Amino acid sequence: MNSYSIKELLNKQPVGDTAEINGWVKTFRSNRFIALNDGSTIHNLQCVVDFENFDDTLLKQISTGAALKISGTLVESKGRGQSVEIQAADVFVHGTADAETYPIQPKKHSLEFLREKAHLRVRTNTFSAVMRVRSALSFAIHSYFQQNGFYYMHAPIVTGSDAEGAGEMFRVTTLDTKNPPLNDTGEVDYTHDFFGKETNLTVSGQLEAETYAMGLGKVYTFGPTFRAENSNTSRHLAEFWMIEPEMAFYDLDANMDLSEDFIKWTLQYVL
């Protein structure tokens, strides 16, 4: 018996073949129709369970959120919404989910609600789509710069530099914040700290990238960046990923051409 991802089954549609799939239950209707999703695609695969052939104790373990392994035959679907479905011959429960308390039910949830369920929200269509786009964008970013002769560099996350100089930074310290050592002027004595000086989470990899560009010509950074401005707006984030290319011998026109070409290329790739 072949083990497939749901994406493979929906693309190949090997009708008549026996298949084994694993995934999480999105819905279980009429004690008969299971909509299963394994994360390989945003689309679900319908699995038909003839409840007369299965023990009632097993069926009671199947609810939204449960993890299952289903084996059966891929057949043409007689219903609407899908072209093929699995006629289940065997169902194994990897793990159950309490139907009364499992939070991600088959309905629309607000973003505020999902923010409180961060460990499960990727199972919703909204967040699974967002993560697929982010994954494709990340790959596109690296592909673009690699194809255009850039070198990828890892800028430090913990740093003593303030590349921007105009914003608040998250401090990083191993000192006892309740009883820090003080110098002669009554200020915190960071010479006793891990690095012997003040350190913070990076606000930009610009300075490090500029030094690398002076030896490699064209480099870019792409990684997490942190800002400690306490501004609760859609344009302020405490943590985000920033792209910073640095090129030696580029003038303003070349910089603008690169920016325009980069945006066009990455968007076309994702779309």
Describe the role of every protein-language-model region:
Residues 1-271:
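Class II aminoacyl-tRNA synthetase catalytic cores and aaRS-like
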